Structure formats: C-alpha cells, structure tokens
A protein has these predicted regions:
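Membrane-proximal alpha-helical signals and transmembrane carboxylates
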Residues: 1-194
C-alpha cells in the first residue's frame, strides 16, 4: 500500500529550484544552515540548476571541496544542471521580469536550445565523474543578461541568456569560449545537429 506526504508536511518544506554559490564562505554558510529556510525544512529534490559565480569556479581547491561536500551529502540531485555567471545577484534581479522562477527559466533555456542535445550540458553528476577520471572536456554554460555589460537591469526585455561557455578540463575551469566554439565541440561529441 502507498503512503504520501500529508498536507502539513509539504507546507513545512521549502523546495528550491536554484542554488547560487558565490564564494567558499557563502557556500559553507548556506550549506551549514541548509536544513531550514526560515521555519521550513529545505528539500533539494526539485533543484534544477546550480549557479556558480565564475570567480569561485576558478578556485580549483575550493571547488574541489564544494564538490566533495555535495557528493558526500547526497542531498543535491546529480542531475541538477551546472551553470556559471559573473554575478548571481545581477541575474536574480531579472526574476521579476520572468514568467517563472529563475531556476526553472534557466533549466528551460538549456532544454529548449535548438540543435543541442541536453546531454551536452553538464550536471553535478558529470562534474563529480570528471573530478575522478579527468578524461572529458565539459562546457559549462555562462549566463549573462544579453545586451548588458554592467550595472543594474533596467530594460524589461532583457533576460538571462547563454552568452559563452566555461571550459571545464581535467577537473578545473580553463577559460571562456564563445557559443560557436562550444557548438562545434558539441557537434564533434555528437551532441549537436549540423
């Protein structure tokens, strides 16, 4: 016989769809206090995207510690997409202009990209595996607000877009490449149509 959660249990939980990681201190503080968001228990089973600021992603030892901790805890789904940006806060400013939560929007952005198989986009599980085997080159989508170079978001039409890709090689960040270069790499890996 099957049992489910009663209404009170669901009301007492928070289900984040986006995890922002800005730096090691921020990550440790969030993770050490992750069990509760206000008065709600946090359940990461619905997490769609882990968004890591590029300045943190470039710190090999700190990223290694973060991945090790996430893998050991097993609370964040392995199939959560990994993306990077210059500023998580700047992207968060766009959420009010979106028809959905930022995490859902970013997931849809990946899954609806024409001509690219969604298996091309790195997940936490792929980063865990690459940490161990150092065989693949992954391309982590770099998200920015298209048409904006810096400052606050002012134009209602500006939404987050994939503007480049961070190359992840031998378990560490190796620099940005443009979308055409990444698409060519996806094509050679059979993840893109010609």
């Amino acid at each position: 016989f099957l049992q489910g959660c009663n209404v009170a249990e669901l009301e007492d939980k928070a289900f984040p769809v986006l995890l922002n990681i800005r730096d090691q201190d921020d990550f440790q503080n969030v993770w050490l206090n992750h069990e509760y968001a206000g008065n709600k228990e946090v359940d990461y089973n619905h997490l769609k995207v882990v968004l890591i600021e590029r300045s943190f992603l470039e710190k090999e030892a700190e990223v290694e510690d973060m991945l090790s901790m996430l893998e050991q805890e097993k609370e964040v789904p392995w199939n959560a997409y990994v993306m990077t940006t210059e500023s998580c806060d700047r992207l968060a400013q766009t959420e009010g202009k979106l028809d959905t939560l930022l995490g859902n929007y970013l997931e849809e952005l990946l899954e609806n990209t024409s001509g690219i198989d969604q298996k091309a986009y790195p997940t936490l599980g792929m980063l865990y595996e690459e940490r161990a085997n150092h065989l693949e080159t992954l391309y982590i989508p770099f998200v920015d607000i298209e048409g904006e170079q810096s400052g606050a978001v002012e134009d209602d039409t500006e939404k987050p877009q994939i503007t480049a890709y961070e190359v992840w090689k031998r378990g560490r960040a190796a620099g940005l490449v443009d979308t055409d270069t990444a698409r060519a790499a996806f094509f050679t890996q059979n993840f893109a149509d010609d």
